[in-house]
């Protein structure tokens, strides 16, 4: 199948790389290396990826081989006039208008089945959102819009190839609302921080332009209206301040000075366009750290419970915050969210877990992409009914694992699975880039002790930890198995007979037919024999 897909891509490239019709005068500027295709060029490009099975074929190759596959690199180069841009790109998708890289944009198209989304020129200048020019932007933000329109437009073209700062205005709305309501927005501090700038601007305007008294009065009236609007904004955030003050009422002054309420400007909606990645990461870092310190000061949990739950999401009292963070990474593509980046930075750099990601179930989460391992752990923590705790990786974490929840988000990890539905789990559709059919066949040929088969069985077993007995194995026929190999052998056997069977929760109030070890060996042998019979019939 992969050879056929690769052959199709090569044919596609041959067609794409044929000399095309010359561009019109209007389209010629768009042919700059690294620039997006024009509408006419995209029509030609997408025509060769129609019907959708052709686009799906390229997506399967991208999911298996990644963006650096030489064939896919050629395809991406064509879509960018011969040069794949290094930095951020923009799209015509209204709900996902920018991406940190073209590779991420291409993966997003595949994972969300929007195969014919187009890359477009970015309308917003990149330099404004760069951390290196943060101070320049803050100072230029004080200039009236009419005076900064022209330089922005002219500068946008020169800097479009640079990377967007991925944090401003893009954090999940629910996270932003929570942070604004549960932490200090500092309405009063906003006013005090903005008034000096306004007064200075007013004086400069008077000195430079020598406006008449009538114009000065008009400006004063406008400023008064702005101040009134800001006061209303500050009053609207008092509820958030009061909610935090209730939580902090029992805390010592030292903790209060370290909490996020001392940094109100970080959460001001009106200055989101000049926030940088470090600030956003610091926000979430401080939020979770302050919650942990509050736990210790108020002794909300006894020492024994706390020692058992170190690294657990449930250790933090700000459950609303964690619920929103979980919602953010589960409802969106986790590895593409600013939430995951900030959260990962906090755990790796501040809490000291490091780059490797392991948990208390002996699993070492696979880093198939920059945030894949972290997202795999967090999705498990957010979704699983079992207690999943992060641990520093050591020799005891031997099981390579990637969450089926991450795989279900269709990121190119090489593994795919359906999200467990109503306490049922059909298994991994893909593992290591290979289908479940391949693994069923290898199980029949090599047995359960084969290293690759063993890793596959462990990954599947740990992908579903629910019910009253998360480590027991029950199926939808109400049979309980002594080991996962016998369960999988039975599932492979039934699937070969076009019969469906899934793993489901083992519950206290249900009765199951418990399979003995001897019977389980018979099940494994039966699948091996049936596969051998099929193989002889096909190839003998």
Swiss-Prot record:
<feature type="region of interest" description="Pro-ACR binding">
    <location>
        <begin position="316"/>
        <end position="424"/>
    </location>
</feature>
<feature type="region of interest" description="Pro-ACR binding">
    <location>
        <begin position="26"/>
        <end position="105"/>
    </location>
</feature>
<feature type="propeptide" description="Removed in mature form">
    <location>
        <begin position="26"/>
        <end position="272"/>
    </location>
</feature>
<feature type="compositionally biased region" description="Polar residues">
    <location>
        <begin position="245"/>
        <end position="266"/>
    </location>
</feature>
<dbReference type="GO" id="GO:0007286">
    <property type="term" value="P:spermatid development"/>
</dbReference>
<feature type="signal peptide">
    <location>
        <begin position="1"/>
        <end position="25"/>
    </location>
</feature>
<dbReference type="GO" id="GO:0005576">
    <property type="term" value="C:extracellular region"/>
</dbReference>
<dbReference type="GO" id="GO:0001675">
    <property type="term" value="P:acrosome assembly"/>
</dbReference>
<feature type="compositionally biased region" description="Basic and acidic residues">
    <location>
        <begin position="196"/>
        <end position="213"/>
    </location>
</feature>
<dbReference type="InterPro" id="IPR009865">
    <property type="entry name" value="Proacrosin-bd"/>
</dbReference>
<comment type="function">
    <text>Acrosomal protein that maintains proacrosin (pro-ACR) as an enzymatically inactive zymogen in the acrosome. Involved also in the acrosome formation.</text>
</comment>
<feature type="region of interest" description="Disordered">
    <location>
        <begin position="183"/>
        <end position="267"/>
    </location>
</feature>
<protein>
    <recommendedName>
        <fullName>Acrosin-binding protein</fullName>
    </recommendedName>
</protein>
<dbReference type="GO" id="GO:0016504">
    <property type="term" value="F:peptidase activator activity"/>
</dbReference>
<keyword id="KW-0968">Cytoplasmic vesicle</keyword>
<keyword id="KW-0732">Signal</keyword>
<dbReference type="GO" id="GO:0002080">
    <property type="term" value="C:acrosomal membrane"/>
</dbReference>
<keyword id="KW-0597">Phosphoprotein</keyword>
<dbReference type="Pfam" id="PF07222">
    <property type="entry name" value="PBP_sp32"/>
</dbReference>
<dbReference type="GO" id="GO:0009566">
    <property type="term" value="P:fertilization"/>
</dbReference>
<dbReference type="GO" id="GO:0001669">
    <property type="term" value="C:acrosomal vesicle"/>
</dbReference>
<dbReference type="GO" id="GO:0031410">
    <property type="term" value="C:cytoplasmic vesicle"/>
</dbReference>
<feature type="compositionally biased region" description="Acidic residues">
    <location>
        <begin position="214"/>
        <end position="230"/>
    </location>
</feature>
<keyword id="KW-0964">Secreted</keyword>
């Amino acid at each position: 199948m992969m050879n056929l897909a690769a052959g199709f891509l090569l044919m596609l490239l041959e067609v794409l790389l044929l000399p095309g019709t010359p561009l019109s005068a209007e389209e010629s500027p768009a042919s700059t290396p690294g620039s997006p295709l024009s509408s006419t060029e995209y029509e030609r490009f997408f025509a060769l990826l129609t019907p959708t099975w052709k686009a799906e074929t390229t997506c399967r190759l991208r999911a298996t081989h990644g963006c650096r596959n030489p064939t896919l690199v050629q395809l991406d180069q064509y879509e960018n006039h011969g040069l794949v841009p290094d930095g951020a790109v923009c799209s015509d998708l209204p709900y996902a208008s920018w991406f940190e890289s073209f590779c991420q944009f291409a993966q997003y198209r595949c994972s969300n089945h929007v195969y014919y989304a187009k890359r477009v020129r970015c309308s917003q200048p990149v330099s404004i959102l760069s951390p290196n020019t943060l101070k320049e932007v803050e100072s230029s933000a004080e200039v009236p819009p009419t005076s900064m329109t022209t330089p922005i437009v002219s500068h946008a073209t020169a800097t479009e190839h640079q990377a967007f700062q991925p944090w401003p205005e893009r954090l999940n709305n629910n996270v932003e609302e929570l942070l604004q309501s549960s932490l200090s927005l500092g309405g009063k501090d906003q006013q005090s921080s903005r008034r000096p700038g306004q007064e200075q601007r007013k004086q400069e305007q008077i000195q430079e332009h020598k406006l008449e008294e009538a114009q000065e009065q008009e400006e004063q009236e406008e400023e008064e209206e702005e101040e009134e609007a800001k006061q209303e904004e500050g009053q609207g955030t008092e509820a958030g301040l009061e909610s935090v003050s209730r939580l902090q009422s029992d805390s010592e002054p030292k903790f209060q000075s370290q909490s996020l309420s001392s940094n109100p400007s970080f959460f001001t909606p009106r200055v989101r366009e000049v926030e940088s990645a470090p600030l956003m990461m610091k926000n979430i870092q401080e939020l979770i750290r302050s919650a942990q310190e509050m736990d210790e000061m108020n002794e909300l949990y006894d020492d024994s419970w706390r020692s058992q739950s170190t690294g657990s999401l449930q250790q933090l009292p700000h459950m609303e915050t964690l619920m929103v963070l979980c919602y953010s990474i589960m409802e969106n593509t986790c590895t593409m969210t600013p939430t995951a980046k900030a959260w990962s930075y906090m755990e790796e750099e501040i809490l000291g877990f490091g780059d490797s990601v392991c948990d208390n179930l002996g699993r070492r989460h696979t880093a198939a992409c920059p945030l894949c391992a972290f997202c795999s752990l967090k999705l498990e923590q957010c979704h699983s009914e079992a207690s999943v705790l992060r641990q520093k990786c050591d020799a005891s974490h031997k099981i390579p694992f990637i969450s089926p929840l991450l795989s279900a988000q269709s990121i190119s990890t090489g593994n795919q699975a359906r999200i467990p539905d109503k306490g049922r789990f059909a298994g991994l559709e893909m593992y290591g880039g290979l289908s479940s059919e391949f693994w069923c066949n290898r199980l029949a040929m090599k047995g359960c002790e084969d290293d690759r088969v063993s890793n596959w069985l462990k990954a599947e077993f740990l992908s579903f930890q629910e019910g009253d007995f998360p480590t027991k194995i029950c199926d939808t026929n109400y049979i309980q198995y002594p080991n996962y190999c016998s369960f999988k052998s039975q599932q492979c056997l039934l699937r070969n007979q076009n019969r469906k069977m899934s793993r489901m929760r083992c519950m206290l109030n249900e009765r199951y037919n418990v399979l003995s070890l001897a019977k389980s060996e018979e099940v494994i042998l039966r699948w091996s024999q049936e596969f051998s019979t099929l193989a002889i019939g096909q190839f003998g």
